[in-house]
Amino acid sequence: MRVSKHYWNSSGAKPAFTAPEQFAGSRLPLAGGFPQPRRRPPEDVNPASAPLPGEGIARQAQHMHWVATWFLLRIIRVCFIIKVSNLQKMHSMSKTVKALLTACALAAAAGAAIAQEQVVNLYSARHYSTDEALYTGFTKATGIKINRVDADDAGILARLKAEGTASPADVILLVDAARLYRGEMDGLFQPIRSKVLEDAIPANLRSLPVADGGISWFGLSTRARLIVFNKAKVQKSDVDTYEELADPKNKGKLCIRSGSHPYNLSLFGSVTEHLGEQKAEAWLKGMVANLARAPKGGDTDQIKAVAAGECDIAVTNSYYLARMMRSSKPEDVAVVNKVGVVFPNQQSWGTHMNIAGGAVARHAKNQANAVKFLEYLAGAEAQNYFANGNNEWPAAKGLNIDNPALKAMTQGQPFKSETIPISAVGANITKVQQMLDRVGFQ
């Protein structure tokens, strides 16, 4: 069965039509003997504005509560009638009364089932098809249904601000440390205490605790920011640190995506934390001078450009390279054979690791279920999905992975990753954006 979603017109009155809800499931219809609920929109929501995608999650929950209430009111009324009629004093009940009470019991059960349905409403920036297995696994393990809305990081944060207290979101999944930090600073997440999460996720891969010890967000998977190079033109020793991307010896050799992309902003925020603002700005200026072409495309485009000879060195997230390494397409195999890979700064602070992470929404209506979902994502089953399905490293401590591409990148050996708090990277982003403007990094 399907549930209908109500739209409100500019006057606040309920219109004469309904539209199908986008979230299918076992629902009672607004049909038959059920009168339409008369609700006004929340005071802080403009009824003239069009409903946001997924707004039906909240409407659906309101309707379930109303239907359960409708059933319970009928039960009370029936019981009152029975008492008034003094039927309880009868030595035997007629078939009619028995049928009536049976109907009461069935109605109560149906209402309770609707009222107690377990759900968690997810806003996710993870657009990876392999994550479907995560959601299925969670529902199978807990019985909690996931209602999901997909958007990019910036879109999700903007939507949470617009929805305010009316937001149906319970869990937020974002794919960049800087955006997680921004959501925390904007008050869009609620700090939580979870021994499961705090034991599993290292302190440097989560937000700093608030006064009562609560954590606003947790990293759930990691990805390295790597340097790739053309093996026929460049020696690995010439690009084994991030600093060498700005060295004059590499003038005219560098390809990179836009400096304002979140993956680069986080890298630049990390370098700023290590070098200080003055040296970091000089480094950014040096990279601009070393560009082989204006920044464009995504990380995969940079890898292909190195293989094609358009540039000699480039910067990419590890999972983009891993995808190509696991591909059987001849063109991908040819690219991989031409490029080498560097995990930068192994002799100093270590390779920058960005995160994908999660938080409980500030106005979560299903807070307990939200915490359960984050705890599930930090468990061994989900962490292995991240590694094998999307070529990410687990954020949780003490897990071994069996991803052939990730092993090949590191030649089966551990590598040194930076240990600065990832929240410090997010705190540097405003400075980084100002520096990019000053040095003309597009």
For the regions a protein language model found, what residue spans apply to each?
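Periplasmic solute-binding protein
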Residues: 180-188, 210-240, 268-269, 353-359
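Mature extracytoplasmic/periplasmic domains
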Residues: 356-419
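Extracellular/periplasmic bilobal clamshell ligand-binding domains
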Residues: 402-442
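A structural signal for short loop-to-beta-strand junctions that line the ligand-binding cleft
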Residues: 167-172, 190-227, 243, 254
